[in-house]
Amino acid sequence: MSGNKDKLIAFNYFGGKFTWLEYLYKYFPDKFTHLVDLFAGSMVVSLNYKGRVIKTANEINADITNFFEVLRNNELELIRLLLLTPCSELEYNNSWEPSADKIEQARRFYVRIRQSFFGLGAQRKNKGWHCAKQHVNAQGGETVSRWNNAIEKLHDVAEVIRSNFQITNLDYSDCISR
């Protein structure tokens, strides 16, 4: 979703480790059986780890864990709805309203995270819609281009989390004690 075809990422996340993955993996033990991603965020560390281990992605932000659970369990419906969603400031502003429907809440979260400035839409406060002013990509402005390019790549993320992931929504200390 970054133009890099070798790594998976569902969305950019403030504090994410996407660009640091190779460096981080060098410090992983040679042999271990369980990768616990305590502060999973965009799950980029565990999504891209190639070793054969049990993967547990823990994130305290319920919007993030809901998004990944919906992507895992309702991939086609979520992606269908996202493809119908325009890249627009009104859509972004409306996405802050909570929904009782898990699929709709996941869609709204993805709108917030992908259409916000630097992915700050994962936070609990509206930091503003990312309006492209300078950068023109193949599909138009930077915001629209990134929105359009990212959605279809969610299929790859869904496939990986279905195959070998446990997703938890716990405080880090509760996750460790398990």
Description of each model-found segment:
Residues 2-20, 72-178:
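SAM-dependent nucleic-acid methyltransferase catalytic core
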Residues 26-97:
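SAM cofactor-binding core of SAM-dependent methyltransferases
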